[in-house]
């Protein structure tokens, strides 16, 4: 399996590289994990790499600024239509931006803090219990009211911890209370997923489960 990680100049990128390598090595199948900076790629290079999975890393800045997001928007628009793609933190914000969503200041900036996660049990969350702790490093967030119809909310954090099953999760998503922050999105048609938190952090519970689901869940 060829996996391309596009690095948005973030220190967490190496963690992603390490985790992905460990997961694939355990499967005892041939693999190649390639890391490229977002300003060191053109689309023709990706054609040559021929990735079977693409991960867009965290990073500083905002997704509407090419100085920070580089080629990533073009990759989402082109390769994301047919190749499973996971956006992490800035990567998720970029997915929302590309499809017409807005990214603004987070309700509460979170840097190096954990929160319990509530999710839909599908995609990267398959087999993951509700309420797992996830590590957050972000001051920007996807604005819930701006999310286009082509994207669905797959996970969130909120101040009251009563959500314990998919039915309740769906109700919270439908109402999108003010104390809710979107932590995950998925495209309804294309194999594109995004997570606002850091699955590559040691403090995120079930991190390798999520990444393995991304790698082999298609």
What are these regions (language model features)?
Residues 19-30:
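A short, Lys/Arg-enriched amphipathic alpha-helix followed by its capping loop at the start of a domain
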Residues 33-35, 103, 153:
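Generic structural signal for residues in well-ordered beta-strands
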Residues 123-189:
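Catalytic beta-strand/loop cores that center a nucleophilic Ser/Cys/Thr
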Residues 1-4:
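Extreme N-terminal starter segment of soluble prokaryotic enzymes
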Residues 29-41:
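A short beta-strand-loop structural module common to alpha/beta enzyme folds
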Residues 201-218:
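Acyltransferase
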Residues 38, 46, 50-54, 199:
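Proline-aspartate-enriched helix->loop->beta-strand connector
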Residues 51-133, 211:
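Cysteine-nucleophile active-site neighborhood
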């Amino acid at each position: 399996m060829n996996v391309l990680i596009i690095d948005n100049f973030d220190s967490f990128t190496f963690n992603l590289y390490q985790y992905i390598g460990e997961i694939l090595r355990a499967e005892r199948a041939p693999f190649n994990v390639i890391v490229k900076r977002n300003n060191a790629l053109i689309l023709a290079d990706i054609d040559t790499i021929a990735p079977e999975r693409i991960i867009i890393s965290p990073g500083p800045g905002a997704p509407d600024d090419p100085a920070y997001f580089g080629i990533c928007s073009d990759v989402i628009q082109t390769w994301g239509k047919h190749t499973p793609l996971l956006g992490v933190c800035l990567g998720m914000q970029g997915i929302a931006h590309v499809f017409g969503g807005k990214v603004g200041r987070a309700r509460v900036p979170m840097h190096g803090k954990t929160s319990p996660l509530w999710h839909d049990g599908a995609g990267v969350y398959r087999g993951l219990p509700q309420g797992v702790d996830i590590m957050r490093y972000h001051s920007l967030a996807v604005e819930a009211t701006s999310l286009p119809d082509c994207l669905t909310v797959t996970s969130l954090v909120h101040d009251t911890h009563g959500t314990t099953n998919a039915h309740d999760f769906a109700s919270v998503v439908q109402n999108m209370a003010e104390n809710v922050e979107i932590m995950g999105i998925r495209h309804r048609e294309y194999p594109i997923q995004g997570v606002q938190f850091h699955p590559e952090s040691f403090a995120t519970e079930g991190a390798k489960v999520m990444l393995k689901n991304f790698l082999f869940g298609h």
